[in-house]
A protein has these predicted regions:
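N-terminal secretory signal peptides that target proteins for export/translocation
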Residues: 1-13
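Divalent metal-dependent hydrolysis catalytic cores, especially in the metallo-beta-lactamase
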Residues: 40, 44, 58-80, 94-104, ...
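Active-site beta-loop-alpha junctions enriched in small/polar residues
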Residues: 44-46, 76, 99-105, 131-135, ...
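Histidine/acidic residue-rich metal-binding segments in metalloenzymes
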Residues: 56-61, 81-86, 92, 111-127, ...
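Mid-to-C-terminal alpha-helical segments outside catalytic/metal-binding sites
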Residues: 281-322
Length: 322
């Protein structure tokens, strides 16, 4: 081996070491700058029916300490407006919102459940999800159970329309849940026709939605939620009974989707909290680092993680491009 070859090998080894050290420092370091101003619209915590890494109080305290602005508390089974009320009392300066997911545990597509939760003291119900684990799309891959339909023969059901009317009445956000892409398109199209102001398509790539379909949903005025899980390293995914056949994506593919749709139509979210996911602090840092490594700019990340969720939730957006 020549001296030139030896020097080249040593140089490459040192470069790999520096890159690894930089990544580890970014994920483990105490700096809160990367999470400053983030609003996570998809945060799982206890109390819940599934195992979680932390409870909502611990999550909110730690998120506030990291500089995060707020979060939507998500449970597939249990309404969380009451939980959000208590967290807002206990952790001032960090805004929490509740959700209602229209799975079988609340009677499926149940307008009365929506109205009751919307009237809970504090009015902290914000996102109303169409079915997730009880959606037809999920049941096709999981154990065979009764599913909760939102449409029939390409037409939204009357009770689905009634829920959408209540979303307008109480100034809520429509989230599409784990429904199949064709139903998500029906929902966003009808929401646009009805004048629903705030709509988010729940992690569409996990439902195998095409870029063309996402572009159409964006034209209907909906935000597209890009959760971290498809580009978090393998072996850190959640239960396959919740999201069947979870597709992984390379950061470069994710970046290409963002470019094709436009960052102004996308919301980055965590979907952390499950025991098989990373903790939300290093998880968010890994997510941001992966997108930046694929060419997404700081300004675009700020737009997708801070400004767009603030707009979805009816908050005054902070200044862009921090």
């Amino acid at each position: 081996m020549t001296n030139e070859t030896t020097l080249e090998t040593v140089g490459k080894t040192l470069l790999r070491f520096v890159l690894l050290l930089t990544a580890l420092t970014a994920f483990a370091g105490p700096s809160r700058a990367q999470l400053e101003g983030i609003i996570d619209i998809h945060a799982h915590s206890d109390p819940d029916m599934q195992p979680r890494r932390y409870d909502a109080l611990e999550f909110a305290k730690r998120a506030k300490a990291q500089g995060m602005r707020g979060a939507v508390l998500k449970s597939h089974e249990v309404p969380t407006a009451q939980l959000a009320y208590m967290i807002n009392q206990l952790v001032p300066g960090f805004q929490s919102w509740g959700t209602l997911v229209l799975n079988r545990s609340v009677g499926g597509i149940n307008p009365r459940a929506v109205e009751i939760q919307a009237m809970v003291k504090g009015s902290y119900l914000k996102l109303v999800f169409m079915p997730t684990k009880d959606a037809e799309n999920a049941q096709a891959h999981a154990e065979k159970r009764q599913y909760v339909p939102v449409s029939k023969n390409g037409v939204l059901l009357p009770e689905t329309i009634e829920v959408m009317k209540l979303i307008i009445k109480y100034n809520l956000v429509l989230a599409t849940g784990h429904v199949q892409p064709s139903d998500a398109l029906l929902l966003t199209s009808e929401a646009h026709r009805m004048g629903i102001k705030s709509v988010v398509v729940t992690h569409p790539t996990l439902q195998h939605t095409t870029v063309a379909q996402m572009q159409e949903e964006a034209r209907n005025g909906a935000y597209l939620e890009f959760t971290a899980n498809p580009i978090i390293p393998a072996g850190q995914h959640g239960s396959p009974t919740i999201i069947p056949n979870l597709p992984s994506r390379k950061p470069e593919e994710w970046a290409a989707d963002i470019r094709a749709i436009g960052a102004e139509h996308i919301i980055m979210s965590g979907d952390f909290g499950g025991p098989n996911y990373p903790d939300f602090v290093p998880g968010w840092k890994m997510y941001i680092a992966a997108l930046k490594g694929a060419g997404i700019t700081d300004a675009e990340i700020h737009m997708m993680s801070c400004d767009n969720p603030a707009h979805l939730l009816g908050m005054d957006a902070p200044a862009s491009g921090k």
